[in-house]
Amino acid sequence: MTKDTTVVLGHHGPVDNASHRGAPLSTGAEWTFELLAKYDRAIGAIAVDEFDLDCYPNQIEVISSEQMLDAYSMVGLPIGYPHWSFGKSFIHHEHEYRTGMRGLAYEIVINSNPCIAYLMEENTMPMQALVIAHASYGHNSFFKGNYLFRQWTSADAIIDYMVFARQYVRDCEEKHGVAAVE
């Protein structure tokens, strides 16, 4: 789903108050990976130091609208098994998007450890900052601290489970045939 656009970010220690108080971190709409990292450090300092959020490390991936449509069709999961219904879903979402019948999310979050946030490359820098604060820290902290999520899900094992499930479906198809598994 991604193309060399992964930036592993997170709270990397203290950020002096001058960097997130007063002078803006940037003034334009354009973003760079360096600027995303700078915003992440500043937002992380506020989230952790001032709001006492407890978060998993962040893995921020910047994706295109085409990749976001692909993520929609895979129900937001970064790893899945091949199935015709995902292609059907992709075509449906793509048609609605291309004809202006729907917009795309600014982000998708996988509540795992590390927390994976997919940001749209079309977002402006202010929107990227909002998404980092909302998804990479807000969702992240909420799910890390949510007792029901912890009771029924292991954030450390979500990705491994998806790999297992994909292989299980493939094994079943090989053993019983695609039609029987369908």
Enumerate the language-model features and the residues they cover.
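Auxiliary, metal-adjacent structural segments of Zn-dependent hydrolase domains
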Residues: V7-V8, H12-S19, A23-S26, E34-C115, ...
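General structural signal for secondary-structure boundaries
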Residues: S64-Q67, T124-M125, E173-A180
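Short pre-active-site segment immediately N-terminal to the catalytic Zn-binding motif
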Residues: E94, P114-I132
